[in-house]
């Protein structure tokens, strides 16, 4: 079997698009931060990098926020700094690169809720649910959204969308090349994360 995907770091003329991942933007390497450098920091730190490197950061921050929510709901325990990037446009400014490496790692290994060691928000900001259960809920993502500067109406719209169970998740999983057992694991993982997300 082979997996084929279209490269998004080349333009239609075949020219390489300048792209920097967030570990590079943060000047984090194996030499400076150790073997697990790409897992250091928090998603709030990553948002600060975006804000300081993107002129029109507000729209891109909403995209980043939605991606962090997605990664949580779909158990992507490998959403580290090298899996977020900025791309340079033809005008010379920077935008958040298209999402990539979107995996449900829970079907392979027992993962933490977040790939980055600093997690989503400081522990002092945890909701009662997060403190009690050890897992974040919608209220924690609302706190995260406010702290990184997502516009309130946009944040609520994104969270409302993710709060709804999405029938396409089941349809796409069913059509995938995963075997039956792994399909069941994928669906169960999504349902568990969604249930946690919706707790109050």
Regions found by a protein language model. Give the residues of each.
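Anionic ligand-binding catalytic core segments
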Residues: 1-81, 85-200
């Amino acid at each position: 079997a082979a997996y084929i995907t279209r490269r998004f770091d080349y333009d239609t003329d075949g020219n390489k698009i300048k792209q920097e991942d967030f570990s590079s933007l943060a000047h984090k390497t194996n030499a400076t931060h150790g073997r697990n450098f790409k897992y250091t920091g928090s998603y709030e730190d990553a948002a600060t990098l975006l804000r300081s490197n993107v002129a029109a950061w507000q729209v891109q921050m909403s995209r980043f926020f939605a991606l962090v929510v997605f990664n949580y709901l779909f158990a992507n325990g490998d959403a580290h700094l090298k899996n977020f990037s900025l791309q340079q446009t033809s005008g010379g400014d920077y935008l958040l690169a298209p999402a990539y490496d979107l995996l449900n790692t829970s079907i392979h290994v027992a993962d933490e809720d977040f790939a980055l060691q600093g997690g989503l928000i400081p522990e002092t900001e945890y909701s009662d649910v997060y403190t009690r259960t050890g897992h974040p809920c919608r209220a924690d993502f609302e706190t995260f959204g406010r702290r990184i500067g997502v516009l309130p109406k946009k944040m609520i719209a994104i969270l409302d969308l993710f709060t709804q169970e999405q029938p396409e998740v089941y349809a796409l999983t069913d059509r995938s090349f995963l075997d039956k057992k792994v399909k069941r694991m994928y669906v169960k993982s999504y349902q568990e994360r969604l249930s946690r997300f919706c707790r109050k």
